[in-house]
């Protein structure tokens, strides 16, 4: 059995936010934590259409309502909805949304290809 720490606790309010492709982001579990995935708390704001070559994303809508563009389709989203975005799918969230994104595998911040 490993002696490595088996857990990580991080409060979003203690993490310094910065502007990224989707809006204001706080990395709760990041690449340097060596977990299997990254977890980000994102305030959607002027998001840009983009895709990832190596990363799948799961969006959990914490608060708000809006829509998401997924390739050529637009879907409605609201608090409590989960959206799975496979790698290669062009996507963009629209509206006043607070989301939790789970990015698998880790390293998504080096795997963003903006289209606008």
Predicted regions and their residues:
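Extreme N-terminal tail/first-helix region
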Residues: 1-19
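A short glycine-rich, His/Asp/Glu-containing loop-to-beta-strand
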Residues: 14-49, 102, 111-113
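Short, conserved beta-strand element in jelly-roll/cupin
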Residues: 42-45, 53-68
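Short hydrophobic/aromatic-rich beta-strand segments that constitute the beta-sheet cores
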Residues: 51, 68-70, 101-102
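Structural motif
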Residues: 58, 65-67, 74, 90, ...
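A cytosolic small-molecule/anion-sensing beta-strand core signal
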Residues: 62-63, 78-79, 95
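Short acidic-glycine-tyrosine-enriched beta hairpin
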Residues: 72-88
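Ligand-binding loop in jelly-roll beta-barrel domains
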Residues: 87-112
């Amino acid at each position: 059995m490993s002696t490595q720490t088996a857990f990580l606790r991080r409060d979003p309010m203690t993490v310094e936010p910065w502007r990224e492709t989707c809006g204001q982001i706080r990395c709760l579990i990041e690449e340097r934590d060596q977990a299997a995935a990254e977890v980000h708390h994102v305030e959607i704001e002027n998001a840009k259409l983009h895709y990832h070559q190596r990363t799948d994303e799961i969006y959990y809508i914490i608060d708000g309502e809006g829509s998401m563009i997924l390739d050529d389709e637009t879907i409605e989203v609201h608090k409590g909805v989960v959206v799975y975005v496979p790698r290669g799918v062009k996507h963009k969230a629209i509206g006043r949304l607070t989301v939790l994104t789970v990015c698998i595998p880790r390293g998504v911040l080096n795997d963003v290809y903006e289209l606008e």
